[in-house]
Amino acid sequence: MSKILVLYYSRTGNTEKMAKAIAEGAKNVGNVEVELNYHVEAEELGKFDAILVGAPTYHHDMPMDMKTLFEEAAVKGISLKGKVGAAFGSYGWSGEAPKFVLEIMKNKFEMLVLEPPLLVRYEPDQNVLGVCRDFGKRVSESLIHDA
C-alpha cells in the first residue's frame, strides 16, 4: 500500500482548506494510505511514497517551519530520491512559496515532482476545492500506476 503525506502550514486557514480537500481526493483512490498533518519530524519523511506540501506565501517566501523541516532532512541525510513530490498553497500577492518547495524537492532531494504547483489566490471556493480533490486523486493514481 502506498503512503502519502499531505503536510501543510496555514496561518489564515486557506492552505489548510486546500490540504483537507487534497487529502480527501487522495483517499478516494483505493490502495493508498493518506496522512494529513501540520507537523512531522524530518525522520518521518522517508516512510512516505509521496509528499505533498502546502506552503502559503508570506512576504515572498515560504514559512520558516517548512524551511526548517527541509534543512533538517538534508542535514540528517534523509533520502527522498525518486519519491513523488508536489506543492500547493494560497497567497495574497505573489505565490512563490510552492514554487520554492518544488525547487527544493527536485534539486536538493531528487524527488519526482508534479509541476506546476497548485496555487490559489486568497480563500479557495467550492470550485477550487474540487480542483484540490482532483490534485490529490492525481497523485494517488500516479502511485498506483507506478507500483
Regions found by a protein language model. Name each.
Residues 2-4, 14-17, 21-37, 47-147:
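FMN-binding flavodoxin-like domain, especially the glycine-rich phosphate-binding loop
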